Amino acid sequence: LRNDLSKSCAPHSVRVTKLCGLERYAYVQHLVSVITGRLATGKSALDVLESAFPGGSITGAPKVRAMQIIAELEQTARGAYCGSLAYVGFDGACDSSILIRTITAAGGHWQFPVGGGIVADSVPAAELEETWHKAEGMLRAM
């Protein structure tokens, strides 16, 4: 994300103010980083969203090649899952969220996709267990 923000921010203004802070929730834990920057002249919050989308925590890295691999391997569209919900205020303020843990309904069917990132040292059984942990909170909510 730091690299993505550099495309829309003033030179040398992008800062990582929090790196991989652990946030605990009922069924999952997330590593959360905070990255800030000052908009470059002529850039807007929409430029930031465009350069940052899709989120690297969803695609993997390097982002462009990871997206090519996802397109080659995934046989169905993700729909809202792993997309983004955002707002941009009239004052230029912006906030966004990647749609994971999201239930959608269409045609009388409800769904909530879950998954995990696969990396070189992934353990398949542990990835499956993590996926079930992610699903558990959604299942209980339904």
Kindly label every feature range from the protein language model.
Residues 1-8, 21-25:
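Short acidic, Gly/Ser-rich segments with clustered Asp/Glu that frequently serve as metal-coordination loops
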Residues 7-10, 123-125:
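Short acidic, glycine/serine/threonine-rich loops at helix termini
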Residues 11-16, 40:
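Short secondary-structure junctions
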Residues 14-30:
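Gly/Ser/Thr-rich active-site loops/lids in small-molecule metabolic enzymes
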Residues 25-142:
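Conserved hydrophobic core element of enzyme catalytic domains
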